[in-house]
Structures are given as structure tokens and as C-alpha cells.
Amino acid sequence: MEYIVRYCPKCQGELHIPDSLSECICLYCGENVSFRVADSLDTRSENELTAEYDKAISELGLLFQGHERIIPQFTNGTYAKSFQEYLKAGERVLRPIEQYAAFSGKDEEVVERVTRELLSLLGQEINNTKTTLGGPTKGRIIEEYRLFLTVYMIPMIRYLKLPFSEALADAIINGWCREHPKFQFSKGSYEDLSSGFKQKLCFITTAVCRAMDKADDCYELNAFRSFRDEYLSSTEHGKALIEEYYRIAPAIVAYLNLCTEYQLRYRQLWSDYLLPCLQAIEDGRYTDCERFYTHMVCVLKEELLI
């Protein structure tokens, strides 16, 4: 049985209910809550629904407002809470749009308008952000928005399970990829992203070796594991580095796997960091390996703003 999040219209309490349930009793205020959109629309005029729809369209910018504050929460231990908070904001904007679509039967038109307006707003944000000497480049700014779309906005739209959720997610991704062909990404879900934090196989070394068609017990991975367990774990600094790596590695892999150029990125990680690290291990130069390892973690943290 799948569960979805809804909010009580009286107290705004967060309710986790089966996706097939049409009504329930609010656990917080005792209100009898109905989720049957069609029923709720019967008592509202077309003018009211249209006005609320237009207002929601004008508020689409709220879907990426504060993205620079939210992105650093995409880590093990903080993603779930930050996503649920973002979900509330997303539902407040998208629910009136869903109701208008249900009333008018114009799902395709609604998806087209939302996509057009949203991408236009994103374009304005990107173009209006001033780049300064030593500050973020335009490419860096686009990368930030791609990251936010990939791990927050698109998963939020899909999580709500609106009648047009999948169509809207596809339209936004397709439109973004047309406008930014060097910054493409694939459709992900909150469930898949959050489960990635619980899997040991999502670490960077494993992901890179898998991209190179190497087995989970290959020579390279065993060498990295031995370095971790026998050298890094022997010092407090090394233990702290391992802990930081475990905090961010699942997020990095989850994001890279949804970027269309992930194979290239993994090859770059191998050639720039992991291969030199492996060669240092083989030569007994463990401090050099630690240096490569530390630099890789710092670079990836900066890339994902975490």
C-alpha cells in the first residue's frame, strides 16, 4: 500500500494516508476531511477556481524560492525533513492548479502553461543573477538550479501524485534540457533518492567502479576498503574524514546518477582522484592517498553546496 501526504484544510496538520483513501478524520483537530476533488468543486464557481488558478500561476516562483538554503540539506539525515517542508510549500501552490484542471478538464493546457511560466521564471532568475570576479559563474548558477530541480522540485511534483504529475515532470525536464543542453538530467523520485542514503552500495568508489564494469569485490574496491579500515580509521582525523564522506557520498551518487553525463563524471573522478589514490596505496604512500581522498571530498562538497 502506498501512502501520500495531505494537509487538513482546518488546522493544516500533515496527514499520511493511503493513496486510495478519499476521506479521513484529522488526527490533530478531529475534522472530517474529504480529498475528493470533484466533490469540493461542486460548491465553487468557475470564476473562483479560475482566480485561484491564476493566483497559483503567479506564485510559481515560490517553488524555487530559497533554493540556495534548501540544497545543503540534501544529505544523509537532513534530506527527509527538508523535503517534507518543501512539499508543504509545493502543495499549497499546486493544489489550486490541480483543482482548476479537474474542473476544466484542460490538463494538457494546464501542464503547458505551468511549464512555460516556470521555465520562464527560472530563466529570469539565472539571467538576473550577477556574476562577479571570484564569484559563481553562470554555468555554476545553472548547475545549482539543475541540482534543485533534480532532487527537490521534480520529486515533489511526483510525490504529490496529482493527475498530471508525471506529465508536468516530463514537460519541465524536457523544456529545461532544450534550454540547457549541457545540464541535462533524468526524472527521479523522493523514494529512490531517500532510499539511496540507506544503501552502502551507493558510495562513490563503488559507483565509479560499477560504471567501469567492475565487480563489488574487485581489486580496486578491496584496496580502497583496506585503506579506509587499516589506515584512515587509525586516526581521529581519518575517522572524521570517513564520517564526512558517509554523510555526503550517497547524495553525490544519487544526484550524479540522474545527470545524463554521469558516465563522464565518474570517469573524471577515477582519473583525477581515485586512480592516483590507488597508485599511492600500491606504493605505500598513504599520506598522498589521503590527500587525494580529502581533495575529492572537498571538491564534491563544493559542487553540491553541502
Label the model's feature ranges.
Residues 8-11, 24-29:
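Short cysteine-rich clusters marking metal-coordination/redox-active sites
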Residues 17-25:
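Short linker/helix segments within small regulatory modules
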